[in-house]
Regions:
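Hydrophobic topogenic segments
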Residues: 1-4, 8-42
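Sec-dependent signal peptide recognition
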Residues: 43-50
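Hydrophobic h-region of N-terminal signal peptides that target proteins for export
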Residues: 52-60
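Sec-dependent signal peptide cleavage junction
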Residues: 60-66, 426-432
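An edge-strand/N-cap motif at the start of beta-rich repeat modules
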Residues: 63-91
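An alpha-helical repeat/solenoid feature that recognizes helix-turn-helix modules
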Residues: 64-66, 93-137, 151-201, 226-268, ...
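Buried hydrophobic core positions in alpha-solenoid tandem helical repeats
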Residues: 71, 75, 142-146, 208, ...
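Long, hydrophobic, well-ordered secondary-structure blocks that form the structural core
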Residues: 205-221
């Protein structure tokens, strides 16, 4: 049996007798900590480079993200902006004689308020509580301003104020400073849809029946449309009858939204719209068949808005061709505002248009886009062939702009895109 002393000596020899043992252990430990220290330094150096980039990217994305909240706030800010020229509650709008936003002059009109309220009322049920508060505030201010544009004797409305005299916004040397235009069906139906007043709605619809093409053949349009008994754009007795398919879409939207009984004039107006589509005049001659909007894409937008209320069989039959036309134009257009209008149109038809990658950086350019949504078209009253000649040369035409309305269109696109995404997610969940 080995003695304890001998055992201890063996252990000592193993531990202390080997001169390289501690040296090797020390080297391994030292190298391990060196590697960890170097690794930590490398990681920290890389994080120092990467973290600011990540932070910048996240911050930039957050800043640039285009949201419904951002656009509603921008619209309300424009409505609340105080100015000696603009009526309280009116969205600032402008006129240009050169189809250039930068050459604009200020204009007071209820038209864009009515368009914005129409859109907000359509979309408000999709808004959050906070968004609805802003939406309701915009609508309330617009309704207070609306009274300044109402006819004193009947439930009709004017593009410009009726409560006081004002300088005619177009060429005063040509038309005179006190010249004004009669009330029109477009502002009337859009204004009445702001109010939701059943009595005024029915009274206005009854009044409209007297303002149709009752003395054919009409000299302000092509012969093929000259015997149609559709609505004129104007209420004025001294004004010639002027057809505009976009205005007629708004009138029929008014009829459909209020569940009014269709009249002979309503049916004749629908038939005129159908004919302009079948003859492809909405594509070949948009300024002639829609003189106050004058753009194929904007005509398509009006058609889609009407058809989104409830199916109109005569238009549903033509829908495939309309969709194809909208798709063709959204691909060929280089104008971002026009692309937005066409994308909204396709979404209203439950189609899948190309996604528009937009940020807050694009908003200013969209607000000041040179595409006019509405045109003050003096030659529209002229008889043929003078009408077509003057419009072909773009003489006596005035282009109307409203940055807040462009924001509203952008907001409408976001709402519809969001709704489309939710439907897709719901369908995918159901499939699973």
């Amino acid at each position: 049996m080995a003695s304890p002393v001998a055992s201890h000596s063996c252990t000592s020899a193993l531990l202390f007798g080997n001169a390289n043992f501690y040296s090797r252990i020390h080297h391994i430990v030292h190298r391990h900590f060196d590697l960890r220290r170097n690794l930590n330094v490398t990681i920290l150096n890389r994080l120092a480079i990467v973290l600011p980039f990540i932070f910048f990217t996240v911050t930039t994305t957050a800043q640039d993200s285009l949201t419904i909240d951002y656009l509603l706030d921008r619209m309300e800010t424009q409505q609340l902006k105080r100015n000696d020229f603009f009526i309280d509650g009116i969205f600032p709008s402008y006129i240009s004689g050169k189809r250039k936003f930068k050459t604009r002059k200020e204009d007071n009109t209820i038209f864009y308020n009515a368009l914005i309220v129409y859109t907000l009322k359509d979309d408000c049920h999709k808004f959050s509580i906070e968004q609805k508060i802003i939406c309701d505030s915009i609508i309330s201010r617009s309704m207070r301003a609306l009274s300044k544009f109402k006819n004193r004797n009947r439930p009709t409305y004017n593009f410009w104020r009726t409560d006081t005299s004002f300088r005619f916004p177009y060429n005063s040397l040509l038309f005179g400073p006190k010249k004004t235009l009669p009330d029109d069906l477009d502002d009337t139906v859009l204004g009445l849809m702001m109010l939701n007043n059943d009595d005024s709605t029915k009274a206005a619809h009854a009044l409209m029946q007297a303002y149709v093409n009752s003395n054919p053949p009409l000299k302000t349009t092509y012969k093929v449309y000259s015997h149609d008994s559709a609505y004129s754009t104007w209420f004025g007795k001294k004004m010639p009858v002027v057809f505009d398919v976009s205005v007629l879409c708004n009138v029929l939207s008014f009829v459909e939204k209020n569940n009014l009984q269709w009249t002979t004039a309503d049916s004749a107006s629908l038939q005129l719209i159908v004919k302009t589509i079948q003859r492809d005049d909405i594509s070949k001659h948009p300024l002639f068949v829609s003189p106050y909007y004058g753009n194929t894409s904007i005509i398509l937008y009006h058609l889609a808005r009407l058809m989104a209320i409830k199916p109109v069989p005569a238009l549903e039959q033509l829908k495939p061709g309309l969709v194809a036309l909208a798709r063709e134009r959204v691909q060929s257009s280089n104008n971002m505002l026009e692309k937005i209008i066409l994308t909204i149109t396709l979404l209203k038809w439950n189609e899948n248009p190309p996604v528009l990658n937009l940020t807050t950086n694009d908003v200013r350019d969209i607000e000041t886009n040179d595409l006019p949504f509405f045109i003050g078209n003096i030659p529209s009253y002229f008889k043929q062939p003078w009408k077509e000649d003057f419009m072909g040369l773009r003489l006596l035409m005035y282009y109307h702009y409203c940055p807040a309305w462009n924001d509203c269109l952008l907001m409408e696109y976001l709402v519809l895109k969001q709704q489309k995404s939710k439907k897709f997610e719901t369908n995918e969940t159901f499939k699973r």
